[in-house]
Amino acid sequence: MMDKHKYRVEIQQMMFVSGEINDPPVETTSLIEDIVRGQVIEILLQSNKTAHLRGSRSILPEDVIFLIRHDKAKVNRLRTYLSWKDLRKNAKDQDASAGVASGTGNPGAGGEDDLKKAGGGEKDEKDGGNMMKVKKSQIKLPWELQFMFNEHPLENNDDNDDMDEDEREANIVTLKRLKMADDRTRNMTKEEYVHWSDCRQASFTFRKNKRFKDWSGISQLTEGKPHDDVIDILGFLTFEIVCSLTETALKIKQREQVLQTQKDKSQQSSQDNTNFEFASSTLHRKKRLFDGPENVINPLKPRHIEEAWRVLQTIDMRHRALTNFKGGRLSSKPIIM
């Protein structure tokens, strides 16, 4: 029987970037992969429903972003990711067109070409200057405030636009992650940092489109062919889901260790403290990247991931409605992380 878990290595790398040790157990990665697959299926089902409400059979990027519209920081990070992706694509297209334009020419008509070059040199320089100006596109969403009015303000082509509150919030989250990454990589050797850089490139979709489509069952869940950017958005969201689960599970494990330490202190307060001092000293020992497995440093276990999943699925009080007159059990669908 073929194993249904196909992303163990990628999940290990994502967990390592998020703060976990290099080799989590198979049960933990399998549970995370099942959770991520369930989230992807839920995203596809809800996006397909939104596309049908628009009267379309294919899923567009706006249908997926609409599901996470309340998380303004994540939406802004996703928009930045898509804009930089579009910028790289446009830069490659312009480089290719510039190469074709410079390589074409008729060698038999040398005099005429020389006259054209001499007369149009200034024009070519202007065209070349325009070629080099590649601006990062802005992803606009149809439910934003500006689309509620018939007339729109003129666009400002300057790059020094003021950031709104959502962009500042997204930048704060990004800076926190960069600070955490800087603290972890500060004392790394060259080989360790190369491994860290490789792990940061882990993805469910990059150069794995066929495997991802078979794994998620896109052809069975959607009628039409999804937009190309939808696969990239799903790759971005899967990375975010794994990082959120890992970071939350690490906080739960740390809180569990603190409670266990306090319990040991209270139990051994009247006894010899030799064993406790040895345990506490080994618990705070610095862990290197390529150290062998030890019994003292425990990896994330499935119970930590399950508790992290429960915490992340808790409905925020701001988005919870009163259910005083419904009675019975309160049914709710999974929350898109």
UniProtKB/Swiss-Prot annotation:
Entry-annotated residues carrying Phosphoserine: 270
Region called Disordered, residue ranges: 92-131
Gene3D superfamilies registered for this protein in UniProt: Histone, subunit A
Composition bias type Basic and acidic residues, residue spans: 113-128
Disulfide-linked positions: none
Alphabetized SUPFAM superfamilies for the sequence: Histone-fold
Annotated compartments: Nucleus; Cytoplasm
CDD domains for this protein: HFD_SPT3
Impact when changing residue 120 to S: In strain: CLIB 413 haplotype Ha2
GO molecular function, one term: protein heterodimerization activity
GO process annotations (BP): chromatin organization; invasive growth in response to glucose limitation; pseudohyphal growth; regulation of transcription by RNA polymerase II; transcription by RNA polymerase II
Cellular component, GO annotation: cytosol; nucleus; SAGA complex; SLIK (SAGA-like) complex
Keywords: Activator, Cytoplasm, Nucleus, Phosphoprotein, Transcription, Transcription regulation
Matching InterPro entries: Histone-fold (IPR009072), TFIID_TAF13 (IPR003195)
Keyword Lyase listed: no
Function description: Component of the transcription coactivator SAGA complex. SAGA acts as a general cofactor required for essentially all RNA polymerase II transcription. At the promoters, SAGA is required for transcription pre-initiation complex (PIC) recruitment. It influences RNA polymerase II transcriptional activity through different activities such as TBP interaction (via core/TAF module) and promoter selectivity, interaction with transcription activators (via Tra1/SPT module), and chromatin modification through histone acetylation (via HAT module) and deubiquitination (via DUB module).
Further comment: Present with 1710 molecules/cell in log phase SD medium.
Family recorded in the similarity comment: Belongs to the SPT3 family.
Subunit relationships: Component of the 1.8 MDa SAGA (Spt-Ada-Gcn5 acetyltransferase) complex, which is composed of 19 subunits TRA1, SPT7, TAF5, NGG1/ADA3, SGF73, SPT20/ADA5, SPT8, TAF12, TAF6, HFI1/ADA1, UBP8, GCN5, ADA2, SPT3, SGF29, TAF10, TAF9, SGF11 and SUS1.
Protein's name in the database: SAGA complex subunit SPT3
Higher taxonomy: Eukaryota, Fungi, Dikarya, Ascomycota, Saccharomycotina
